[in-house]
Swiss-Prot record:
Domain of life: Bacteria
Taxon lineage: Bacteria, Bacillati, Bacillota, Clostridia, Eubacteriales
Domain spans labelled CoA carboxyltransferase C-terminal: 1-235
NCBIfam families membership: accA (TIGR00513), AccA_sub (NF041504), PRK05724.1 (NF004344)
Family according to the record: Belongs to the AccA family.
Subunit structure as annotated in this protein's UniProt entry: Acetyl-CoA carboxylase is a heterohexamer composed of biotin carboxyl carrier protein (AccB), biotin carboxylase (AccC) and two subunits each of ACCase subunit alpha (AccA) and ACCase subunit beta (AccD).
EC number(s) reported in the record: 2.1.3.15
Organism for this UniProt entry: Ruminiclostridium cellulolyticum (strain ATCC 35319 / DSM 5812 / JCM 6584 / H10) (Clostridium cellulolyticum)
Protein's job: Component of the acetyl coenzyme A carboxylase (ACC) complex. First, biotin carboxylase catalyzes the carboxylation of biotin on its carrier protein (BCCP) and then the CO(2) group is transferred by the carboxyltransferase to acetyl-CoA to form malonyl-CoA.
Subcellular location per the Swiss-Prot or TrEMBL entry: Cytoplasm
Protein name per the record: Acetyl-coenzyme A carboxylase carboxyl transferase subunit alpha
Record's keyword terms, sorted: ATP-binding, Cytoplasm, Fatty acid biosynthesis, Fatty acid metabolism, Lipid biosynthesis, Lipid metabolism, Nucleotide-binding, Transferase
Keyword tRNA-binding: no
Length: 260
């Protein structure tokens, strides 16, 4: 598949959304609502579930599964209150020593006037600052689209995984073609240049694992993820909180480093 083919696959309406992953990986999931500052944002699903016998804080960007739900969830484009809801759950996870698992599927944070007035940039920045210093394990998984800061706001983690047909980029191919080359017809060429596929980002060291989709057999994907998440969480609990934070900080320090 070309890079643009993967862009279209990541956006497919038939692709499982975050709710499917939560339902098939965790049991007894209880959702929490609101940011205690403005309101609730349906684009972000956050709560606690069990992975085996271990309580886990789960935070997910949810696009919705039909037209009505997609509208209610703003197509997965979160407002500031969504990111602040996520932040609230991260802090609770740290307080109660629960690991955090994030599922990311968004074209980007919502960029409307109301979102800007309520501090969209600040909300994303606060998440980045908090996640780099959070004293519990964090696993972030890109399951579809990973668009710009809206995705990054849940992707500062000990490990970042991508499904093989997911994408992760600072800008969409359409946006890049229009802004840089003033030619939307070059979108396929731009998709290759952006290096936004799972294989590209793994080879660059931006992500830590590519999750195979088994030809669309997502039941196997859920089982595979369940095992991998539990294994990784248990691995990181072998380290002290200070060591965990130090390793995470060093991981992001290495991004973009050039070695001779």
């Amino acid at each position: 598949m070309s890079a643009y083919d993967k862009v279209m696959a990541a956006r497919s309406k038939d692709r499982p959304t975050s709710k499917d992953y939560i339902k098939n990986i965790f049991t007894n999931f209880t959702e929490f609502h609101g940011d205690r500052r403005f309101g609730d944002d349906n684009a972000v699903v956050a709560g606690i579930g069990l992975l085996g016998n271990r309580p886990v804080t789960v935070i997910a960007l949810e696009k919705g599964q039909d037209t009505k739900e997609r509208l209610s969830r703003n197509f997965g484009s979160a407002h500031p209150e969504g990111y602040r809801k996520a932040l609230r759950q991260m802090k609770l996870a740290e307080k109660f020593n629960r690991p955090v698992v994030c599922f990311i599927d968004t074209s980007g944070a919502y960029c409307g006037i109301g979102a800007e007035e309520r501090g969209q940039g600040q909300a994303i920045a606060e998440n980045l600052i908090t996640m780099i210093d959070l004293k519990v394990p964090i696993i972030s998984i890109l399951i579809g689209e990973g668009g710009s800061g809206g995705a990054l706001a849940l992707a500062v983690a000990d490990e970042v995984w991508m499904l093989e047909n997911a994408i992760y980029s600072v800008i969409s191919p359409e946006g890049c073609a229009s802004i840089l080359w003033k030619d939307s017809a070059r979108v396929k060429e731009v998709a290759e240049c952006l290096k936004l596929t799972a294989d590209d980002l793994y080879s660059l060291g931006v992500t830590d694992m590519v999750i195979k989709e088994n030809g669309g057999d997502f039941i196997r994907v859920y089982e595979d993820l369940s095992n991998k998440i539990l294994h990784s969480i248990n691995k990181y609990y072998e380290f002290s909180a200070d060591k965990l934070v130090k390793m995470r900080f060093e991981k992001y320090q290495r991004l973009g480093m050039i070695t001779q």
